[in-house]
Amino acid sequence: MKNKMKVVLADTDESFRMMLQRMIEAAGDFRVVGSVGSGADAWYVIERECPQLVIMDVILPELDGFGLLDRMAAMAARPRAILVSAFCQGQVVSRAMTQGAESFLPKPCEVNELLGQMRHVAQRAEAEDARNAALERLVTPVIHEVGMPAHIKGYQYVREAIILTIKDATMINAVTKVLYPTVA
């Protein structure tokens, strides 16, 4: 990892959060930018700090883990999420993964296992960033080749639409219903 990944911790158990923060920062790969005890506070910190990773419990006051996952899914730079919870029935785990969680660990968990999951998420994020940059480098010359200069107002939208369509070819069949709203 080039830069330390920014992490937010959200759990009602303050002693667990403090222990986790110490262990995460001691590992050296990550920087904890927020440690909070409620979903509403977590959302505030996520909006302010733009972390790459959120480690949270499902059960949080004011806004639960599922609500946070929903809100994070709507963000342009969506942070990745690892859920750590004692409430780990099959339906809960399935719903968390469906809503975009990267991983779900039962509480109590081994800190080394969590750190391993965090590193795995960081590696996947780095690989995805590299793929996106490579795709952008491929698309940009094609746009120039068809004669669209970069200073035109809709240039960024066109480039984004092409990249989204390359990533998900089904979007080409629903340009006005899916592609346009996604780009906008």
Task: Label each PLM-derived region with a short phrase.
Residues 38-41, 64-67:
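Acidic catalytic/metal-coordinating carboxylates
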Residues 49-55, 60:
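Active-site beta3 strand of CheY-like receiver
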Residues 130-184:
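C-terminal output/effector regions of signal-responsive regulators
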Residues 11, 57-58, 85:
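Active-site residues of response regulator receiver
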Residues 78-88:
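A short, hydrophobic beta-strand element within the central beta-sheet of small alpha/beta folds
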Residues 11, 29-37, 45:
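Short hydrophobic/Thr-rich beta-strand motif most characteristic of the beta2 strand and flanking loop
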Residues 61, 89:
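The feature encodes the CheY-like receiver
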Residues 91, 109-118:
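C-terminal output helix
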